């Protein structure tokens, strides 16, 4: 696919989704049955309305059945499914109905709360509609077919995705809101985080623990001893996920994370990528100064590359109260961020250090344990 975007001055090639792959393979199958000859490429309209010519990597056909495969091309966005083959079988039937299912390597939903019903193949609504429409257009109104999408590498590749967190077991999902993969875009990632949050809400939870990643997850379960059922990753998208908790009407949010990540939120930085915003040292220096720390400590902390290194200096100088001050500021900033939209969300914060463990919490830990057990 020769379409590009520019990001930070660099040129990146776009790609196409697993949903577009499946639609293209399905169309190739119908064309092979119709014409009784192999098809090297097909033109498909993506879910977003873009017309693409997609190469077909594998072809096999008989009078009423065909198999085709399309290799997933994520462009310069090398995700978990990039390069894998998405296979489709299409078989003509005597019924006018067109049906779609997933086979080997396509995950199955095992929990309520996502856009796929429990027991169904993990083919999301937009690509499902697109695949069915593509086949229907090729067949006409009076003929029917069964469509089976499968991916021999799917179960292994799914280990690199968030599917297990969403209760999708046994393989990958067939995805694609627009059908196009845009490199350097966070939208797909954010959508998957939202899906997990929606699933928790649909299961009846009204309070949630947001963690930046695995460190936070481990700390919640292994140090604090809280249940894992309430945990959802927010990655670097703190502001986005806070807004999502409000949209979904969660009553309480507990943010638990490494101090080096959450300290940024105390200064109003709600997307915590280091490439976008850092300011860890500056935030620490400013808060230490307000506590009356000596200039020599401020100068040494300002030189530190990590909050772990700064922590040694802060502890030695007896200014560990700075962590409590900053934790309260994280809470205040987060609640202010949601202030002008209803419903209100109660937010608490726990921060920790890899070396020193628990640093600060906006409530007594035992009170939090009682609330979140």
Swiss-Prot record:
* Annotated protein name in UniProt: Cobalt-precorrin-5B C(1)-methyltransferase
Methyltransferase among the record's keywords? yes
Enzyme Commission designation: 2.1.1.195
Pathway as given in its UniProt record: Cofactor biosynthesis; adenosylcobalamin biosynthesis; cob(II)yrinate a,c-diamide from sirohydrochlorin (anaerobic route): step 6/10
What keywords sit in the KW lines?
A: Cobalamin biosynthesis, Methyltransferase, S-adenosyl-L-methionine, Transferase
- Recorded GO MF terms: cobalt-precorrin-5B C1-methyltransferase activity
Provide the reaction this enzyme catalyses.
Answer: Co-precorrin-5B + S-adenosyl-L-methionine = Co-precorrin-6A + S-adenosyl-L-homocysteine
- One short Pfam family name for this protein? CbiD
PANTHER family, alphabetized? COBALT-PRECORRIN-5B C(1)-METHYLTRANSFERASE
- By its UniProt entry, which HAMAP family does this protein fall under? CbiD (MF_00787)
**What family does this belong to?**
Belongs to the CbiD family.
Q: Which InterPro entries match?
A: CbiD, CbiD_sf
Gene behind this chain?
cbiD
Which Gene3D superfamilies does the UniProt record give?
Answer: CbiD-like (3.30.2110.10)
Species this protein is from: Listeria innocua serovar 6a (strain ATCC BAA-680 / CLIP 11262)
Q: Which GO terms describe its biological process?
A: anaerobic cobalamin biosynthetic process; methylation
